[in-house]
């Protein structure tokens, strides 16, 4: 498991729904328990974006 997959697992455990979408203008968005991560990024970029969005949730 890479770091992104570990964060995804943590997010799901916390009741979050994470989807990859074609976002414009940002790498990630959060609204309630839903997180959108921009499609097409590298795994390290997705990891960084997901970590940032999870930080906004806690």
Label each residue range with its predicted role.
Residues 1-58:
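Active-site hotspot residues in diverse enzymes, especially metal/ion-binding acidic/histidine motifs
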């Amino acid at each position: 498991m890479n770091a992104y997959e570990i964060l995804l697992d943590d997010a799901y455990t916390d009741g979050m729904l994470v989807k990859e979408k074609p976002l414009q203008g940002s790498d990630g968005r959060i609204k309630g328990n839903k997180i959108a991560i921009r499609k097409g990024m590298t795994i390290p970029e997705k990891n960084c974006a997901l970590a940032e969005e999870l930080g906004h949730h806690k």
